[in-house]
Amino acid sequence: MTTEHLDRIHSPADLRKLDRRDLKPIADELRAFVLESVSKTGGHLSSNLGTVELTLALHYVFDTPHDRIVWDVGHQTYPHKILTGRRDRMATLRQEGGISGFPKRSESEYDDFGTAHSSTSISAALGMAVASRNAGVARQHIAVIGDGAMSAGMAFEAMNNAGVTSDINLLVILNDNDMSISPPVGALNRYLARLMSGRFYAAAKNMGKAVLQHVPPVLELARRFEEHAKGMITSATMFEEFGFNYVGPIDGHDLDALIPTLQNLKTLQGLQFLHVVTRKGRGYKLAEVDPVLYHGPGKFDPAVGIQAAKTPAKRTFTQVFGAWLCDQAEADPRLVGITPAMREGSGLVEFEQRFPKRYFDVGIAEQHAVTFAAGLACEGQKPVVAIYSTFLQRGYDQVVHDVALQNLDVTFALDRAGLVGADGATHAGNYDIAFLRCVPNMVIATPSDENETRLLLSTCYAYPGPASVRYPRGAGCGAAVSAGLDTVPLGKGVVRRRGARIAIMGFGTLVPAALAAAEKLDATVADMRFVKPLDVELLRELAATHEALVTLEDAAVMGGAGSAVTEALNMAGLTLPVLQLGLPDVFIDHGDQAALLAGVGLDAAGIERSVRERFASLLG
């Protein structure tokens, strides 16, 4: 791969020295470099291939880092990272000690706002714009947001607030690629489709390109053109009702259209909204055909594409959930499945195919997803909300107020619990035990392997109230999974190994590591299964027959399962040493999942080491 043009770019300042016509070969080399890099490291691909020209145009037109660019979600920022001095570190992408897969303020002065969760960009850019106004600093503020992210209420809350905020410069760029991770859904997506498919759209786009090539960046002339193009496409838009001056749609891969348009918008004061149309996977045919498959691939050979594994892989927890959901739906016609735009990631593909009328993708709208489930439960339906642990944080008030307070029968399947590996701190599901344990009526189940996941899903589904089952990303220990829909007693654990003096109480998928450590420690291991209700009877037995207890969880130790155990011991008036092992009170960066766990002492060797250090006198 030749990069003779890209080799000359060490910062956006180098871009701005070039003639516009020199950018096309840079775009081609940049796209090829992104493909080659991601194929070697894994990471987000389709979205980054789709933002090459837009990224080039933004850094070419605006004075970054003085001008602020906030990238919504942020998984489309690899071209941005490459152009802002991090090209030589792309080989470390999403690896321990390497660069993040998302914008990160501590990583570069060009990363103006840390993102990874959706729909935050307009709010952040608006805050920056107001701060610049208050400080008397003249700069531009740009929020780049995808059409999938526009389905979240927060984006519209920010636009509504911006509409009544005076004397600021804010440009919102809608990157319309008709995809979030799963295809976007809802009325907004249909509205955007109507804008793009209007009878004047194609003519307007072509004429706009021709006109812009000859338009100098003069304020009045720019306004005249924008009003003319706008009138050809639509007489009024939803975005203008918020107080934004709407421009577009324009081709997001055409630098000759993008750059003059951005230059004109740069001269305007106030609220601007630019609608650009891009294609996920642009320039790599396999990703264009299947942008979902190539959304976040592992390592692969670009010449042949992603291939099926030669040897059968162990079932992932997500696959176990997906199979259970279909089986439970077959047995109970009241079951409905809900996902906030994560059909593939949460394992609902087969469920949608088999039960399309009972499948609901509500878009990137976690608050709505939870309360929608509450409404279904009010009328006798049995909703299962399949959601990443980190994204349930966005619907916490709804969990408390709309579900738990009314003791409604909603089951939460919390995928990606604990450390998630390459996606890092922004996607870690470390806090669910702590923030759910304090909510009355809520059941929290922590399965230790694949079969336990199925058992506890069935158990929580049978419970007539709010319940959550948390399980991690990836595969477990390879346990055989039963075919039935059996349940276990609610709030009851089970002893997996009998030992002496020390008892390890495991919550979740670290139980196999605890068993390995216990062989060397001659310790008892209890698979507690539930954080809430906690098996106090088993706890009392372990306290009475052992000299020390160890609690173990792949979640934040502060407020977690270990805290529940110490609280229960205190309530019972029982006093004995307790070692609480879990995730420390820090944000843990990206890296290999197993290596990160080992780094905080939560592999078998680390568990053994911690127990020996704390209870050396008991172990001799």
From Swiss-Prot:
Protein's pathway: Metabolic intermediate biosynthesis; 1-deoxy-D-xylulose 5-phosphate biosynthesis; 1-deoxy-D-xylulose 5-phosphate from D-glyceraldehyde 3-phosphate and pyruvate: step 1/1
Residues where Mg(2+) binds: 147, 177
Pfam families: DXP_synthase_N (PF13292), Transket_pyr (PF02779), Transketolase_C (PF02780)
Gene Ontology molecular function: any one: magnesium ion binding
Cofactor names: Mg(2+); thiamine diphosphate
Top-level taxonomic group: Bacteria
Enzyme Commission number, as recorded: 2.2.1.7
Binding site for thiamine diphosphate: 75, 116-118, 148-149, 177, 284, 366
GO biological process: 1-deoxy-D-xylulose 5-phosphate biosynthetic process; isopentenyl diphosphate biosynthetic process, methylerythritol 4-phosphate pathway; terpenoid biosynthetic process; thiamine biosynthetic process
Annotated keywords: Isoprene biosynthesis, Magnesium, Metal-binding, Thiamine biosynthesis, Thiamine pyrophosphate, Transferase
Disulfide feature: none
GO cellular component: cytosol
Record note on cofactor: Binds 1 Mg(2+) ion per subunit.
Record field: catalytic activity: D-glyceraldehyde 3-phosphate + pyruvate + H(+) = 1-deoxy-D-xylulose 5-phosphate + CO2
Family the UniProt entry places it in: Belongs to the transketolase family. DXPS subfamily.
Record's subunit section: Homodimer.
NCBIfam families linked: dxs (TIGR00204), PRK05444.2-2 (NF003933)
Function: Catalyzes the acyloin condensation reaction between C atoms 2 and 3 of pyruvate and glyceraldehyde 3-phosphate to yield 1-deoxy-D-xylulose-5-phosphate (DXP).
Name this protein carries in UniProt: 1-deoxy-D-xylulose-5-phosphate synthase
Species of provenance: Bordetella avium (strain 197N)
